[in-house]
Amino acid sequence: MASSSGLRSCSAVGVPSLLAPSSRSGRSGLPFCAYATTSGRVTMSAEWFPGQPRPAHLDGSSPGDFGFDPLGLATVPENFERFKESEIYHCRWAMLCVPGVLVPEALGLGNWVKAQEWAALPDGQATYLGNPVPWGNLPTILAIEFLAIAFAEQQRTMEKDPEKKKYPGGAFDPLGFSKDPAKFEELKLKEIKNGRLAMLAFVGFCVQQSAYPGTGPLENLATHLADPWHNNIGDIVIPRNIYGP
């Protein structure tokens, strides 16, 4: 039934969804809801919270834009562009980090927590998968890392095109994924979705390690599965004598 405040309608136009598979254009086939008011103004519904209006400054044109900005961080266009750039870089680091944490532990080569213990020793020697690293002392590694990151950051700062900052192409696209514009948009959306999951995964690794120091995520998972009732986050934050021996 129509009310005096407005009519609610659903359009079949596709918008991105976290759960739905992406099409070649990077959009899903799920419908979005719009609100048609008596004044004729139509407002798209935010995909992250159906029924809530999409913020005016988020038009859905950016990969992974689902209308979620409760703190209004993206209201200033310059800030929004900087946040998009920062997010995609952190996504890529996280996607490198998560398999880097899981794979060595799965192969029985130690966990990511113990891998860095050498740095705390006076004459510590860095190793990679059990093998000594050339020039593997802490000052040398820090110097190499500083110079490498400084060079990369300088090149990024000199680039004025915001799209090329995020997607430089060229040598960074050896398989030519960006040649097909429609496919490229789909891959952008997949990258941001997987990157966000990877960032959450790494936060989970850090929380898990803080709760059970010295253990890796796979070891901790195996311990939890062996005795879920006693080996869980509640075992850390709630005294055990409250819920039994």
Curated annotation (Swiss-Prot):
Annotated chlorophyll a 4 binding sites: N194
Keywords: Chlorophyll, Chloroplast, Chromophore, Magnesium, Membrane, Metal-binding, Phosphoprotein, Photosynthesis, Photosystem I, Photosystem II, Plastid, Thylakoid, Transit peptide, Transmembrane, Transmembrane helix
Amino acids binding chlorophyll a 5: K190, Q208
Post-translational modification: Photoregulated by reversible phosphorylation of its threonine residues.
Upregulation: By light.
Binding site for chlorophyll b 2: R92, V133
InterPro entries the record matches: Chloro_AB-bd_pln (IPR001344), Chloroa_b-bind (IPR022796)
UniProt binding sites for chlorophyll a 2: H90
Biological process per Gene Ontology, one example term: photosynthesis, light harvesting
UniProt-annotated binding residues for chlorophyll b 3: E153
GO cellular component: chloroplast thylakoid membrane; photosystem I; photosystem II
Presequence extent in this chain: 1-44
Family annotation (Pfam families): Chloroa_b-bind (PF00504)
Residues binding chlorophyll a 1: F68, E87, R196
GO MF, any single term: metal ion binding
Chain sites annotated for binding chlorophyll a 3: L129, E191
Residue sites binding chlorophyll b 1 per the record: W48
Residues annotated for chlorophyll b 4 binding in this entry: R156
UniProt-annotated location(s): Plastid, Chloroplast thylakoid membrane
Transmembrane annotation, as ranges: 93-113, 132-152
Cofactor detail note: Binds at least 14 chlorophylls (8 Chl-a and 6 Chl-b) and carotenoids such as lutein and neoxanthin.
Binding site for chlorophyll a 6: H224
Family, per entry: Belongs to the light-harvesting chlorophyll a/b-binding (LHC) protein family.
General function of this protein: The light-harvesting complex (LHC) functions as a light receptor, it captures and delivers excitation energy to photosystems with which it is closely associated.
Assembly: The LHC complex consists of chlorophyll a-b binding proteins.
Protein name: Chlorophyll a-b binding protein 1B-21, chloroplastic
Lineage: Eukaryota, Viridiplantae, Streptophyta, Embryophyta, Tracheophyta
